[in-house]
């Protein structure tokens, strides 16, 4: 008898997931009622019931993810393009030496490390960018359409670490998925670097801040798990865990792929490099 090889299948689970039903969204409804957003919603938020205010400290600029020292002061503007350098330029001769064992490192600790890094980035960017101004002035810019899709009407109150822990609790995954998120975010920041405004000043198109980080995380985990893992869940489950509607998650998947230029492959060497730099960041802070 011929046996066919098993194909990848989405999985579901009957466990109860609090705070994510069809009428109540954890991170609130989508922000845009203008024509670039076909999925606006009037659903209410459960933030006050399930979250606490995050404590965000320390600066990171809105350049590449790991390209600043933990004690560096926040830049007052994003015009110093000459000083902007990518994560690749931060690697040294010891990059290939394994510092963090991706396979065996505790996922809970990795989530804490990634959350600390992301908190630094979004705290700095919250101080240097005006999301409302960007949304109101640039809605006609085709380059910004996939970026603006990740902004909600209100800034979610749930902390990044709590959000990642929630994802891991109800849609458990592995370390390589979380590390790949850093790679994707860094690629997007490079793909959507600086553009010239009307006044001739340079402007960073893609900026991770408190207004878009939650949608970026749940969408990134959804896409990355499907691409890298043999085991993943249905979009309806990811949407419920992430606190957004299924329709919106489906839309955000495409926007995320556009931001990444549909390039999702991450080599072992690249992932290990990011893991080592993350570990170094954690020990230095």
From Swiss-Prot:
Modified residues (Phosphoserine): 69
S-S pairs: none
Residue ranges with Low complexity bias: 1-14
InterPro entries: Cyclin_PHO80-like (IPR013922)
Assembly mode: Forms a cyclin-CDK complex with PHO85. Interacts with the substrate proteins MMR1 and YJL084C. Interacts with the CDK inhibitor (CKI) PHO81.
Family under the similarity heading: Belongs to the cyclin family. PHO80 subfamily.
Protein name stated in the entry: PHO85 cyclin-7
């Amino acid at each position: 008898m011929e046996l066919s090889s098993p194909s990848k299948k989405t999985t579901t689970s009957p466990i109860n997931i609090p705070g994510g039903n069809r009428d109540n969204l954890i991170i609130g409804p989508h922000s845009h009622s203008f024509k670039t957003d076909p999925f606006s919603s009037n659903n209410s938020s459960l933030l006050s019931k399930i979250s606490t205010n995050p404590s965000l400290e320390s600066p990171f600029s809105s350049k590449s993810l790991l390209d600043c020292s933990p004690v560096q002061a926040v830049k007052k503007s994003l015009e110093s393009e000459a000083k902007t350098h990518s994560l690749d330029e931060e690697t040294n001769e010891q990059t290939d030496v394994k510092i963090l064992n991706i396979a065996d490192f505790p996922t809970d600790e990795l989530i804490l490390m990634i959350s600390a890094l992301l908190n630094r980035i979004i705290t700095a960017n919250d101080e240097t960018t005006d999301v409302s101004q960007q949304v109101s002035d640039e809605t006609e810019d085709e380059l910004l359409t996939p970026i603006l899709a990740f902004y909600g009407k209100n800034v979610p109150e749930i902390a990044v670490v709590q959000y990642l822990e929630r994802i891991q609790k109800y849609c458990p995954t592995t370390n390589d998925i979380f590390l790949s998120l850093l790679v994707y975010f860094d690629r997007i920041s490079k793909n959507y670097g600086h553009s010239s405004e009307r006044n001739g000043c340079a402007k960073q198109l893609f900026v991770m801040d408190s207004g878009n980080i939650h949608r970026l995380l749940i969408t990134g985990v959804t896409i990355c798990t499907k691409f890298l893992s043999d085991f993943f869940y249905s979009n309806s489950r990811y949407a419920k865990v992430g606190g957004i509607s299924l329709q919106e998650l489906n839309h955000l998947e495409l926007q995320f792929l556009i931001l990444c230029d549909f390039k999702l492959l991450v080599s072992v060497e690249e992932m290990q490099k990011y893991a080592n730099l993350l570990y170094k960041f954690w020990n230095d802070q």
